[in-house]
């Protein structure tokens, strides 16, 4: 009853806040919403920008925007009353989206009615091209779908569109405008990279190997899942040998920057990691936005994270280190692509990873990346944020 009363109250409250209200990953200042927010301020500085962030992220929000704690009543009211809302995790999960019985249809209709508000527009960018299966496609979750009424999905390629339309059962309209967080990765200059390195506190005269594993979960954020989400891979590596291999193949001195999923970052002790690896690993979670680290990375190493697809736009080498590939693909999650169809070499052992680094071929890699982008129907061109900004300006000036 309380939930229904809350829905009614939200439905009846007027959409009086003539502003763009942003949130990312339910409380972070990052990702595509951040890119859109920056472009909106650049092109239309007169439009009020509000960010809903967790308390520890408030200082990350620039002074031209108003930061509100997402876990407060003020945050809830701003989200409810805003004329335009932008996020990257719509994620209203439902187990009934694929059911056709009358009761399920009625319940979904009621939910849609109360979450649809006249005069309010919501854009969701999602957060990457998927390799790992989601929603109804995921192993063991064939009845699960996602839906968020009154929301337009903004996507960067036809493949992701097909996946999202399937797992939302066609309940959300899609616009193919590109992935705003990727704009930063186009037309980078050496000066851009050095400026960003300085902002992140990365060594200016060393090359950066970014290790960014995905989060593995059986439905729980426990210590075992945290361990399996990058810590285990680190223990299988000899970091000194790894950096030597990159130095031999790509010249210069290299450093390893580890960027863990935020669920993992919240659980691990970076001081312990620094001691265990004699200070040879740099904390890549010190700043909230993954895109900044991708800008600085001279090479990327991951497993099933969508950052591999974003990173292709830099033209720099990417390697997959995936010791638990078979279990992840066949038992735990499932993947949309055969791993051998990707442009990246995939290694299940550390020795094989070293071989892949030594045998890397630039021209072959570039050709494979271009073919893959054509295959998935890529529309990213570095101007996605501008397109979304134009839509927001139009919505707020109606």
Task: Enumerate the predicted regions with their spans.
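Short acidic-hydrophobic, aromatic-tinged amphipathic segments that line or gate anion-handling sites
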Residues: 66-71, 281-286, 342-356
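Nucleotide-activated donor-dependent transferases that construct or modify glycoconjugates
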Residues: 2-26
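A donor-sugar binding/catalytic signature common to diverse glycosyltransferases
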Residues: 87-107, 112-124, 287-331
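C-terminal amphipathic helix plus adjacent low-complexity
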Residues: 1, 6, 224, 350-398
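Active-site and donor-binding regions of nucleotide-sugar-utilizing enzymes
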Residues: 19-187
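Catalytic binding pocket for nucleotide-activated donors in carbohydrate/polymer assembly enzymes
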Residues: 274, 306-376
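Conserved catalytic-core segment of nucleotide-activated headgroup transferases in glycan assembly
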Residues: 31-36, 181-272, 347, 384-386
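Donor nucleotide-activated moiety binding/catalytic core segment of transferases
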Residues: 68-84, 262-306
